[in-house]
Amino acid sequence: MFVESGYHATAMDEIADRAQVSKPVLYQHFPGKLDLYLALLDLHTAKLPVLVTTALESTTDNAQRVAATVDAFFEFVERKDAAFRMVFESDLINEPAVAERVERMMGLCADSVSVVVKEDTGLPQEQAHLIGMAMVGMCQVVARYWLSKGTSIPREEASRLVATLGWRGLGGLPLHEDGTGEHPGA
């Protein structure tokens, strides 16, 4: 219901009716509407980092890793439960507890990407994390844009285009040559 109507327009009475429980039973489990919302948000924000990590671990070929990571975001926004709307388009994004969860989720996704970037380039962690955040930010924004425009470009094609863009950037980073993890010029 939060996905359909937003936080402010959703009443606990409606939630109890939809869940086929009494309102007192609902309040036994969740002291308030925000607590319920945060529990659902925790459930949804746990999904994307798993998709990203799985994508990165699916191959050792970096171009394929980029493609799989990009597609993980397209998969997340295309899910039937529309959980991405609660995560990225919440009317509560200015609520500190909500913002912290979304930032943590994006940080976990960026961390996963940065591990690969750091291993392959030897860049310092802060730089690798910045690149990871750039990658996941691009994926998140483009996947949401693609879905909002009615998916006239098939998912596979849209994902491929974005992966090509991402790989052209990431593939241009110099690999460390001596196996020490030191980036040339660092």
Label the model's feature ranges:
Residues A46-P49, P96-T121, H129-A134, V141, ...:
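Amphipathic alpha-helical packing segments from all-alpha helical-bundle domains
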Residues M1-E4, K47-S58, M138-K149:
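Solvent-exposed, amphipathic alpha-helical segments
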Residues E4-H8, T59, K80:
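Short coil/turn segments at alpha/beta junctions that flank glycine-rich nucleotide-binding fingerprints
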Residues E75-R79, A83, D111, V115, ...:
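Amphipathic C-terminal alpha-helical segment
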Residues I15, L40-L48, V52:
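Generic hydrophobic, amphipathic alpha-helix propensity
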Residues A39, T53-R79, G132-M135:
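Hydrophobic alpha-helical connector segments
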Residues A68, E75-S114, G122-L123, S148, ...:
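Short secondary-structure transition hinges
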Residues M1-D35, A39:
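Helix-turn-helix
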